[in-house]
Design a protein with these regions (language model features):
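Asp-based, Mg2+/Mn2+-dependent phosphohydrolase catalytic module
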Residues: 1-5, 18, 100, 104-230, ...
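N-terminal helical cap/lid subdomain that shapes the substrate entry/recognition surface
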Residues: 2-100
Length: 243
């Protein structure tokens, strides 16, 4: 019997790479317009090199970038980049198709929903709130809550403990086989690979199920939960219509 579903955030709920690329590209154009003497291609490579070294959530990436290029921080250029980045970030953060509908369906099945992310706490909450899906989640566990990243079992285990759910009663949904799937399987959870968010061309995910659209998760959970869960969802919808 499934009682809970745990989601990764980036590239599972939100199209993170598309969003990040758009924000960085906007910052690069603004910094060049402010006087930075570099081609967009050169700037992009150096910025993502810094992200590769220090993490994709690194908050001082443009400071480090300017230090590497100029030997100092030109605050006019830095300000132009940060403002453009933030504007683009606000306008391009979107969920994958059907995310809100899938979460609503799961919510109506009376399942507990959780997020487990390697990102910092504030960044995770900002994304959930901006997408308008924060109200669906009983539990949100971030890097700040455990100090370790997936595939270490601690983040997912903490989410299960907070929801008071056993591993065999929960499903883990994620896009990164080596992190999301392996860690959850170690705990004994059912795993679902979000192939629509896969950035690595993964051939064998090792997951129990794979989906190409988040709505495909619904029949999987219904099957694992038995007919009672589907009956609850249908009954809830009928009750709402009668009102």
């Amino acid at each position: 019997m499934i009682r809970a579903v745990v989601f990764d955030v980036d590239n599972t709920l939100v199209d993170f790479r598309k969003w990040k690329n758009a924000a960085v590209d906007a910052a690069i154009v603004a910094m060049i317009d402010a006087g930075l003497d570099l081609t967009p291609e050169q700037a992009r490579k150096k910025i993502f090199d810094i992200y590769d070294r220090k993490g994709i959530e690194y908050q001082e990436v443009f400071d480090d970038f300017l230090h590497e290029i100029l030997g100092y921080v030109d605050y006019r250029v830095l300000a132009a980049g940060i403002v453009a980045y933030r504007r683009a970030r606000e306008g391009t953060l979107v969920s994958y198709p059907h995310v809100s509908l899938a979460l609503l369906r799961l919510f109506r099945m009376h399942l507990k929903l959780a997020v487990v992310s390697d990102a910092p706490r504030m960044q995770v909450w900002m994304r959930l709130v901006q997408l308008g899906v924060d109200m669906f989640f009983d539990t949100v566990v971030t890097f700040d809550d455990t100090g370790v990243r997936k595939p270490a079992p601690e983040p997912v285990r903490k989410a299960l403990e907070l929801m008071q759910v056993k591993p065999e009663e929960a499903v883990m949904v994620g896009d990164w086989a080596e992190r999301d799937i392996i860690g959850a399987k170690t705990l004994g959870m059912t795993t679902v690979f979000a192939r629509y968010g896969d950035e690595f061309g993964t051939n064998v995910s090792g997951a129990d199920f794979e989906i190409s659209d988040v709505l495909e998760l619904i029949p999987i959970v219904e099957k694992l939960s038995g007919p009672e869960s589907h009956h609850k969802d249908t009954k809830t919808q009928r009750s709402r219509r009668r009102r």
